[in-house]
Amino acid sequence: MAASELYTKFARVWIPDPEEVWKSAELLKDYKPGDKVLLLHLEEGKDLEYRLDPKTGELPHLRNPDILVGENDLTALSYLHEPAVLHNLRVRFIDSKLIYTYCGIVLVAINPYEQLPIYGEDIINAYSGQNMGDMDPHIFAVAEEAYKQMARDERNQSIIVSGESGAGKTVSAKYAMRYFATVSGSASEANVEEKVLASNPIMESIGNAKTTRNDNSSRFGKYIEIGFDKRYRIIGANMRTYLLEKSRVVFQAEEERNYHIFYQLCASAKLPEFKMLRLGNADSFHYTKQGGSPMIEGVDDAKEMAHTRQACTLLGISESYQMGIFRILAGILHLGNVGFASRDSDSCTIPPKHEPLTIFCDLMGVDYEEMCHWLCHRKLATATETYIKPISKLQATNARDALAKHIYAKLFNWIVDHVNQALHSAVKQHSFIGVLDIYGFETFEINSFEQFCINYANEKLQQQFNMHVFKLEQEEYMKEQIPWTLIDFYDNQPCINLIESKLGILDLLDEECKMPKGTDDTWAQKLYNTHLNKCALFEKPRMSNKAFIIKHFADKVEYQCEGFLEKNKDTVFEEQIKVLKSSKFKMLPELFQDDEKAISPTSATSSGRTPLTRVPVKPTKGRPGQTAKEHKKTVGHQFRNSLHLLMETLNATTPHYVRCIKPNDFKFPFTFDEKRAVQQLRACGVLETIRISAAGFPSRWTYQEFFSRYRVLMKQKDVLGDRKQTCKNVLEKLILDKDKYQFGKTKIFFRAGQVAYLEKLRADKLRAACIRIQKTIRGWLLRKRYLCMQRAAITVQRYVRGYQARCYAKFLRRTKAATTIQKYWRMYVVRRRYKIRRAATIVIQSYLRGYLTRNRYRKILREYKAVIIQKRVRGWLARTHYKRTMKAIVYLQCCFRRMMAKRELKKLKIEARSVERYKKLHIGMENKIMQLQRKVDEQNKDYKCLMEKLTNLEGVYNSETEKLRNDVERLQLSEEEAKVATGRVLSLQEEIAKLRKDLEQTRSEKKSIEERADKYKQETDQLVSNLKEENTLLKQEKETLNHRIVEQAKEMTETMERKLVEETKQLELDLNDERLRYQNLLNEFSRLEERYDDLKEEMTLMLNVPKPGHKRTDSTHSSNESEYTFSSEFAETEDIAPRTEEPIEKKVPLDMSLFLKLQKRVTELEQEKQLMQDELDRKEEQVFRSKAKEEERPQIRGAELEYESLKRQELESENKKLKNELNELRKALSEKSAPEVTAPGAPAYRVLMEQLTSVSEELDVRKEEVLILRSQLVSQKEAIQPKDDKNTMTDSTILLEDVQKMKDKGEIAQAYIGLKETNRLLESQLQSQKRSHENEAEALRGEIQSLKEENNRQQQLLAQNLQLPPEARIEASLQHEITRLTNENLYFEELYADDPKKYQSYRISLYKRMIDLMEQLEKQDKTVRKLKKQLKVFAKKIGELEVGQMENISPGQIIDEPIRPVNIPRKEKDFQGMLEYKREDEQKLVKNLILELKPRGVAVNLIPGLPAYILFMCVRHADYLNDDQKVRSLLTSTINSIKKVLKKRGDDFETVSFWLSNTCRFLHCLKQYSGEEGFMKHNTSRQNEHCLTNFDLAEYRQVLSDLAIQIYQQLVRVLENILQPMIVSGMLEHETIQGVSGVKPTGLRKRTSSIADEGTYTLDSILRQLNSFHSVMCQHGMDPELIKQVVKQMFYIVGAITLNNLLLRKDMCSWSKGMQIRYNVSQLEEWLRDKNLMNSGAKETLEPLIQAAQLLQVKKKTDDDAEAICSMCNALTTAQIVKVLNLYTPVNEFEERVSVSFIRTIQMRLRDRKDSPQLLMDAKHIFPVTFPFNPSSLALETIQIPASLGLGFIARV
C-alpha cells in the first residue's frame, strides 16, 4: 500500500538519535508524497521538524503497535527493523525482567548480572518434553529442542553459543549441559553427568580470567561433545579447545588478572600440603601482580580451590597428579620472578643462587646450573657447525616468558586430555550433542593476532549461520508449497577468501614466518602489494604502515601487524625444553611427549567413535631441529585446520544458535545500554536474521487464526463454509498488491508490515463500530433521560397539588378545633373560680371550729392537772419523812462503799498497767486478736460495774447533802432551841466540813477514774480499729494472692494447653515430614534396586553369553535374577540360596568400583531406612505420649513397682488356675471316657494326650516368659544391633567371594582395599556399639537391683500393714506414702539442683520404663487370653470327640472291632475361615493368584480384595499348623510376586491400582486378625475366633506397609504420565468458553514444532480420565481414605503443572485466559462434589492456580488494587505474583499493560513475606501416604473360591 496510507496523523515512527540510537515520535499531520519535512511530536513533549533525505527520500521506520511489543519472537513483529528489535529487547529486559528472546532460530540471551531463580530442577522438568514455541524463550527450550531432534531424526546436534566477553556464553553453555545431564541421566552408576558438570570448574580455573569486561572471562574456545547411547542416556563426553590466550600467563593489562588457578594457589598457600610449593601472596609474583587487581569481589579463591580439587577427584585425577599440577603451576609463578642482569648489550646473567630460579628448579626437578645457562644462552645450528650464543637481557626475558607460556599450554592440553579420558566411555556412542562455547566478534583499540583469529572464526560461523537460516526459510516455503523467490543476503565468502585462500593473509603470514629474516614490516608490505586496491574488503590506514583494515560482516577492524609473526611462530628454545624433559619430576616429561602419541589413532578410535572425537587443538610450534612435519605447523595453520574440522562437524549436525548480549560495560544488573546492544546485535547476526526474515514472509498465520482475528473485517455474505476460501476472498479485497501475501497449504504468509496494516484496518473498523455504538447509546441515554425528567415533573406537580389540598384541609380542621377549645376553656375558668371560693369558705369554718374546741379542751385539762399536783405534793411530803428516817443508814453504807471503791480503784490501776504492757508486747499480732477482744470485753464489763458504783455513790451523796441542808435549815429555824446544844452544833459543823472535804476528794477521784477509763477506752478502741484494719488488709492481700494464684494457674493451664496443642501440631508436622522422608527413601531404594537389575541385564546382554535358568522371557514373571529384595529385614526371612555368576565374572572384567558403590549405597539406604523407621516410631510414640501425658502423670511415680508386682502375681495365679483347670479336665476326661477309648494305646487317647501335653508345655513356656520378663527387657536391645552387623558382614563376605572369582588382578586389589576399609569401619562401629550396649546393660542391672530392693521393702511394709487393724493400717499406709513421696521429692530436688539435664533424662527413662513394662504386661495378658481360647477349643474338641465316639460305637464294636478314625461331615457354617494347601503347591498358588491374574476380570466378577482374603486364609492355616517355614515362604513369595507383576506391568493403572488395593486389604487383615486389642475391638465374636494364635507378624506388616507405599508411589507416577499430556492442553490451551479468549493480535511466528500434534485434549478429556481412575479404584475396593489421598495427589499434579506452564508462557497470561482457568477449576470442583470428595483436601491443592486466575482478572492500577492482590494471593509466592504481573499481556490494544511502578509497589508490600524464592511448584512432589486401619466386615468362613481362578488344589478348612 502507499506510504500515504501508513504515514497518517498519530502514526508513530522511529527516528535516529545520537544518544539513544533510536527515539520514538508521533506524526502531527498526514504525510503526502513530495513532502520534504515531517512534523513530529517526541515522547518528552517536544515538537520536531524531521527532514527527509533529499537523495533517497526514505521515510523513518514505522513503530509496531503497543500490543505487539514484548513478543517472545522478534520475527513475530510486523515491522522488522533495527529499532523495533532493540525496543522489543529493551521492554522485555527492563520492564518484564525477561533475559531470553527468540529471533527466528536464534535465542538471544541478555546477561542480567544477577542471579535469577530460573535454572532450578523444577524449571528443567517444566521444559522437558515441551515444544519449543509453546513455552517462553529459555536456554532449556533450546536444549530440549536439540535433545528431541537427536532422538527423532537420529541426527547429531550442535548448540553454538557466542557473544562478547562477559555476555554469559560460559554460563549458557553450562546450563545447557546441566539440562542434558538432568533429563537424560547416565547409563551407568558412575554418574557421567556429574563428571561432565564437574569439568566446568576445572576448565574455568585454568582457562578463565578476570578482564575489564568480565570477572570470569573464558580465554579459550571449547566444543564439548556429550555422547548418548541408543536409549539417549549420557554415556560420556569429549572436549576440544581452541586458541588459548597464552600471553595472559606472562602479561595482564590494568585491572585484569591472570588465570584463576594461580590466585587460587596463592590463597591456599597456607595449607599443609602446599608448604612445599613455597608460595605467598599473589602480589609477590610478577605474573600475578601486573594487573593490580588480585581480588574479585564476592569470590573466595580458597573456596574455589577446594571446588577445583573436588572436581579433579571426581574426574579421577589422583591426588599425586593434582599435586603435580599445582607443582608445575607454582614453578611457573617462581619462573616469572627470575631476574636478569646485563653484562653488555648482547649478553646477560642471572645472580648466583638466585632464589626464584632455585625454587623453580627444585619444583621442576631440573639442574640449576643447566637451566641458568640456557636461560641466558641459545644454540644456533648452521649447515656445518653448531655454536652457543649469549642473548641480551630483553631476549632472555622474552625467552623466559615464552617458556612459561609453553609450559602452561602443555599443562592445559594435558589436563584437557585427562578430562577427556575421565569422560570417555567404553559403551559405543550412538549420537552426540555438541555445545560450542566460542568467543564472539571482538574489536578493541589495539587488535592483534588473537583478535584476528577470533574474528576469522566468527566469519566462518556467520557464513554457516546464514546458510542455515536461508535453508530453513527455503524448507518452510517448500513445505507450504508457495513460490520460492531468491532472498538476497550478505555472503561473507569474499572475506573468508581474503583470509584463508592462496596468497591470503594467513598464507602470506606463514610464508613470512619461514623467511630467515622475516619481520612484521615486510609482511605488511607484502599484504599491501597483494591486496590493496585489489580487494574491496582490504584497506590500509592513512596514518600507519604497520596496520591493515578488514571489512568484516559486523564492522571494520584495524589490526596492528606488530607481534603477528612472533605469535604465529610461537618460538621456544629447544635447549630449555630438553632441560625440562630431563627432569626427575616424572610428570613434567609427560607434558612434552611427541604429538604423535597425543593423537594416535588407537586413542581416537578405541571407543568405537569416529577419529574426530579427539582432535589436537593449537599445539605449539615444534622446536628447531625437529624434522617431523606436523611440528613445523604455525599457530595460524593449526587454527585454520582445527576450524575446518569444527565446521565439518557443525555442518554434519543440526545447529541451534544462542547469541549472548552484554547489556552494559559496568556490570549493572538489568541496565540496558542501547549503543552497546546495537553493536552486538549487528556483530552476532541477529539483525541479519531479521533482514533475511523481513525479505521474505516473516508473518505467518493459520487460516483459522486469521479468520478468528479478522472476522470483523468480513461481511456476512463473505463468510463461506470453506474457511480457506473465505480468507482468500477477504485478503484480495483488503490488500490489492498480491505480492504482499501468499497462500500456503496451512498458513497465510505476509510480508513485513502487512499484519500491522491489517491491524490498522481492524482498529479502524472497531473504532468506527465503537463510534456508531456510542452514538446510538448516547441518543438512547438522552431520550431515556428526557422521559425520566418528564415523569419526574408530572410526579412533582402531583405531589405539590396534593400538598396544597392537604394544607387547606388542615386549616379548616384547626379553625373548628380552636372554636371548640375556646368554649371549653371559658367554661373551665369560671368553674375553677367557683371552686376556689368554695374551698376558702370551708377552710375558714374549719379553723374557727377548731379554735373553739381547743379552748374547751384547755379548761378541762387545767382542772385535771390541779388534781394531779395535789396528789403529787402529798406523796412528796410522805416520802420526805421517810427519807429523813433512812438518812443515817445510807450514810453508813456510803462510807463502807467508799472504802470498797478505793480498793477496787487500786485493783483497776494495776490491771490497767498490765494491759499497757500486754499491748506493747503483743501489738500487731494477728493471732492474739481474739484474746485481746475477750479481755476488752471483760474490761468493759468491769468499767460498767465501776460506773454503776459511782452512780450509786453520787446518789447517796446527793441524798445526804439534801438531808444535811434540811437539817441546817431546821437548825437555823430553831436556833433558839439549839442554843442549848451549842457544843453539838460545833461538832456538827466540823463533821460537815469533813464531809465536804471527803466529797471533794471523791469528786476528784471520780474525775481521774473517768479520765483514765476514757483514755483506756480510746486506746482500746484504737487498738481494735488498727487490728481490724490490719486484719482487713491481710484478708485483702490473701484474696489478692488467691486470685493471682488462680489466674496464674489458669494462665499456666492455658499456656500448657496451648503449648501442648502447638507441640502436638509440630509433632504431627514432624511426623508427616519424617513419613515423607521415609517414603522418599523407599522410592530411592527401589530406584537403586531397579538400576542394579538393569545393570545386570545390560552386562548379560553385553556379553551375549547364554545363561541357563536366567534368560528373561515375555511372561509376567521372570527368573530370580531380576528379583530385588525389599529391605534388610525382609532379606533375612528369605530362604534363597545365594546365586553366583561365575560364567560372567570369569569372562568379563567387572567395574568393581561400580559394585562397591552400589553395595555401599544399598547398605546405607537400608540403615537410613531403619533409622527413619525408628525415628517415625519415636515420633508417633511422642505424639501418643503428649496426648496421654495429663492422664498418666499422677500415676507415673507411685504405682510402677506395685503395678508390676501385683500384675505378675495375678498372672502367676492365673496360670496356676489354668493349670488346675487343665488337670481337672484331664481327670474328668479319664473318669467319663470309656476304658477302651481312654486306654493308653487308643488312638483317641493318644491324640488327646498329645494335645493336652502340648498345651501344658505351652503353659509352662508362658509361665517362664512371665518369670523372665525383666531379663527380656534388657536383652531385647542387645539382640538387635549385632544382628544387623552380622547381616552386614554376611553381605560383605558374599560380595568378597564374588569379587575373588574375577580375573582382573587390579580390580581385585582395589576391591580388597575397599573391603579392608569397610571391615575396619564396621569393626570400629561394632566396638563402639558393644561398649555403649555394655554401659547400658550395666545401668539397667543397677536399676533392676535397686528396683528389687525397693520391691522387697515395699512387700515387707505391706506385710506389716496387713497385720494392723484397719484404722491403723490406713494411717500407716498414709504415713508411709507421705514419707516415700517426701524422700522422692527431696531426691528429685537434689538431682534437679545438681544436674537438670540428668533429672530430665531420668524422668524420661523412668516414664519409658513404665511404658515398656505396661506393654509387656499387656502382651502377657494377651498371651493368657490366647491360652484360654486354646483351652476352650481343646475342651470343645474333646467334648465333640466323646459324643461322636459314644454315638457311633456300639458295645459290641467296642470289644470286638478295632478303633478306626471316623470322618464327620461338616456343615458350611462350621468352616474355620482357613484354606489348606500343600507346600509344593505354593508356586502354583502364587502363579495363578498373582502372576497370571487379570485384574479386569477379578474386579468385575468377584468380590473386591479376594486375592488378599485368599492369601490371608492360607496364612491362617499355616499359623494354625504352627509351621513357621510355610508362613515365611508364603509371605516371601507373595511379596516378590507382587513386585514382579508391578515391574512387568507397572505402566498399567488398572494393575497397579488392583494390587495397591489388595496389598492394603492384606495388610488390614493381618492387623484385624493379629489378636491385638486395638484391632480386635472392631471385630465380631466370630472374627475374633479367627485371630492368629502362634505367630506375631508385626514385622511382615511393616514390610507390607513399605510395599504398599512403593505401589502407591508407582500409582502416582502412572497417574502423572497419563495426565501430563492432557493438562496443559485441557486446562490452558483449549477454549472451554468459546469466544472469550482472543487470538494473538499478530502474525505470531509459531516456531516449527519438533513434535507433531498428537491430538488436542480438552477439559472433558481430563474429567473422563478422572472418572476412569475413580471407577477403577472403586471397582477394586480401594479404601475410601486411600482414594481421597490419590485424588488429592491427582489434583495437585493438575494444579502444579497448569500453574508452572502459566508462569512460563507469556501468551497465557491474559484476562480472558484467567476466566477460562477459573471456569476449568470450577468444573474440577464440581467433579469433586459429584464424587463426594470435597473433604479430601484436593480443592486446597488448586488454591495457587485459583489465585493465579484471579490475579489475571483483577484490576492492577491503584494502591488499593495492590493491597487487594497482596491479601488475596496468600497461596502464591512473591516470585510467582511478580512473574504473573510481568507476563501479563493484553489480548487487544484497548487493554492497558501492568505498569512497572505497580509491580514495584507489589514487591514493596510483599518484601516482608517469608516464603520460598522458588518460582515453580514441585510437580514431582508426592504427599506422604498413610493407610488408616479399615477392618472388613466380611466373614472369612463365607468366602467361596471361584473355579475361574484355577485354585482347585486348595481346600477350605
Curated annotation (Swiss-Prot):
Residues with PTM Phosphothreonine: T1032, T1758
List of residues binding ATP: G163, E164, S165, G166, A167, G168, K169, T170
Residue span, Dilute domain: 1532-1808
BP term (GO), one: melanin biosynthetic process
All residue ranges annotated as the IQ domain in the record: 766-788, 789-813, 814-836, 837-861, 862-884, 885-913
Modified residues (N-acetylalanine): A2
Boundaries of every Myosin N-terminal SH3-like domain copy: 8-60
Disordered, as annotated region: 598-634, 1105-1134
Parts forming coiled coils: 914-1237, 1314-1443
Similarity-based family: Belongs to the TRAFAC class myosin-kinesin ATPase superfamily. Myosin family.
Function: Processive actin-based motor that can move in large steps approximating the 36-nm pseudo-repeat of the actin filament. Can hydrolyze ATP in the presence of actin, which is essential for its function as a motor protein. Involved in melanosome transport. Also mediates the transport of vesicles to the plasma membrane. May also be required for some polarization process involved in dendrite formation.
Name the UniProt record assigns to this protein: Unconventional myosin-Va
Protein species of origin: Mus musculus (Mouse)
Gene name as annotated: Myo5a
